[in-house]
Amino acid sequence: MKQEIQTGDITALSFEQALKQLEVIVENLERGDVPLEQSIDIYERGEALRKHCDRLLKAAEAKVEKIQLSEEGSPKGVEPLDSK
């Protein structure tokens, strides 16, 4: 079933919205029934969506913190994930 490819501002999309649009683009391209010019256009949008998803993942990764435990095993604070 051919799904509609969204247009508009990619930067306003959440990770989940961008990923869903990227999945629709892949499905449409894999079917092979999209005209060449349209294939190029949606491929370019797909690449922009992929980059947007990558930026959002990197931003989320930077926010992830590792919980530090005391010698007794109870939480005593947090530190950046990449600190050690």
Swiss-Prot record:
Q: What class of enzyme is it?
A: hydrolase
Q: Which UniProt keywords apply?
A: Cytoplasm, Exonuclease, Hydrolase, Nuclease
Q: What is its EC number?
A: 3.1.11.6
Q: Which GO terms describe its cellular component?
A: cytosol; exodeoxyribonuclease VII complex
Q: Which reaction does it catalyse?
A: Exonucleolytic cleavage in either 5'- to 3'- or 3'- to 5'-direction to yield nucleoside 5'-phosphates
Q: Where in the cell is it found?
A: Cytoplasm
**GO MF annotations for this entry?**
exodeoxyribonuclease VII activity
**Cross-referenced Pfam families:** Exonuc_VII_S (PF02609)
Output the InterPro entries linked to this UniProt entry.
Exonuc_VII_S, Exonuc_VII_ssu_sf
Task: Give the GO terms filed under biological process for this record.
Answer: DNA catabolic process
Primary role: Bidirectionally degrades single-stranded DNA into large acid-insoluble oligonucleotides, which are then degraded further into small acid-soluble oligonucleotides.
Q: Which PANTHER family match?
A: EXODEOXYRIBONUCLEASE 7 SMALL SUBUNIT
Q: How does it assemble?
A: Heterooligomer composed of large and small subunits.
Identify its protein family. Answer: Belongs to the XseB family.
Q: What name does this protein carry?
A: Exodeoxyribonuclease 7 small subunit
Q: Which organism is it from?
A: Bartonella quintana (strain Toulouse) (Rochalimaea quintana)
